[in-house]
């Protein structure tokens, strides 16, 4: 829906996912959307370089969230909320509102 505006559908997915879930890491996005990991790493890098999102480390994992100092953050979130409202309900439930781990599992920890 917004890929023509953002230039790529992965960026749209990342921004909407961050809007709903507040934080994310690349392998979580890969698992949810079933796209290559590199696509998400590249999109997150572009957004971070533009100042839209920031990253911090939680253990060995780089976690991304919206940059609270981004000057157009409130406008961007309002725009994304409006776009999210137009998504079909099954897409909202499948990709954005499902039970998603908020922290990565320790490597090697049994399920």
Q: Predicted segment positions?
A:
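Short, cationic-aromatic polyanion-contact patches
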Residues: 2-11, 25, 54-80
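A generic structural signal for short
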Residues: 3, 14-15, 31-32
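Short acidic, hydrophobic short linear motifs in intrinsically disordered regions
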Residues: 24-32
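Non-catalytic effector/regulatory segments
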Residues: 33, 47, 56-57, 100-107
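Glycine-centered, phosphate/nucleic-acid-interacting loop/turn motifs that mediate DNA/RNA or nucleotide
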Residues: 51
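Amphipathic alpha-helical dimerization/coiled-coil segments
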Residues: 71-111
